[in-house]
Amino acid sequence: MIKQRTLKCIVQATGVGLHTGKKVTLTLRPAPANTGVIYRRTDLNPPVDFPADAKSVRDTMLCTCLVNEHDVRISTVEHLNAALAGLGIDNIVIEVNAPEIPIMDGSAAPFVYLLLDAGIDELNCAKKFVRIKETVRVEDGDKWAEFKPYNGFSLDFTIDFNHPAIDSSNQRYAMNFSADAFMRQISRARTFGFMRDIEYLQSRGLCLGGSFDCAIVVDDYRVLNEDGLRFEDEFVRHKMLDAIGDLFMCGHNIIGAFTAYKSGHALNNKLLQAVLAKQEAWEYVTFQDDAELPLAFKAPSAVLA
């Protein structure tokens, strides 16, 4: 059978919090089968757990948060969640000694390296996927996102940014998902922001960790980072990275075709909730062997070596 995945060992890293600008220690721990993805704040006494759950997601101006019933939150979970989706990690406990996951370089790549460093272990329990059975679409003004049935996981994302740094030919990206494709084509794409927004937020004591080290920064005309872009279409690739993380908030890889136009965290989450709320639109599936499994979810050679 296709088995659930966790880590082989505990790994730790430090980074800077986007909001506070303070050092954050991140610890990733293996977890037993059917645990799911658990985010944990150890700076609170007692520590507070936040299971990844579409209904717990709140989108703020700066990041995605998970919020519990007591309005306690953990922030900036989206890029780590994308790395978990990319490598198909089903069970993990993620600890931080702060109210937020460190921003690292603004992409998912540092988290991918950390997960690969820990090693991926298979558990003796069938991995559950969410398979889309009917088309589900959500809209917000001219923005929209939808899932259609498809035997794999495909993504097609279009942005509409009227900015000199973003050529019109670099506003759409489409791919057939796989762990290898995610690592090569998506994981390194960084988040982005306007210099004026960062300066304004920092003047109000917000976004204190924001810098050229953790984002693509633009003014009205150009990219300000000395090293430029990692891909010509890094902006839309990062929006796809965000979507991969947002859609994994149900704790399962999804089998279906995702298409979006100008979508963001809030609309991606709205789509996920709309799918899960419509019982006839999806089903849980497991697979007995590799031959049945959609190519999208075969483990990359580097992972289970």
From Swiss-Prot:
GO terms for cellular component: membrane. Gene3D superfamilies: lpxc deacetylase, domain 1, lpxc deacetylase, domain 2. Zn(2+) binds at residues 79, 238, 242. GO terms for biological process: lipid A biosynthetic process. Pathway: Glycolipid biosynthesis; lipid IV(A) biosynthesis; lipid IV(A) from (3R)-3-hydroxytetradecanoyl-[acyl-carrier-protein] and UDP-N-acetyl-alpha-D-glucosamine: step 2/6. Its cofactor is Zn(2+). It is an enzyme of class 3 (hydrolase). It catalyses: a UDP-3-O-[(3R)-3-hydroxyacyl]-N-acetyl-alpha-D-glucosamine + H2O = a UDP-3-O-[(3R)-3-hydroxyacyl]-alpha-D-glucosamine + acetate. It comes from the Bacteria. Its EC number is 3.5.1.108. The keyword Ubl conjugation does not apply. One of its GO terms (molecular function) is metal ion binding. Belongs to the LpxC family. NCBIfam families: lpxC. Catalyzes the hydrolysis of UDP-3-O-myristoyl-N-acetylglucosamine to form UDP-3-O-myristoylglucosamine and acetate, the committed step in lipid A biosynthesis. This is UDP-3-O-acyl-N-acetylglucosamine deacetylase. It comes from Escherichia coli O45:K1 (strain S88 / ExPEC). The lineage of its organism: Bacteria, Pseudomonadati, Pseudomonadota, Gammaproteobacteria, Enterobacterales.
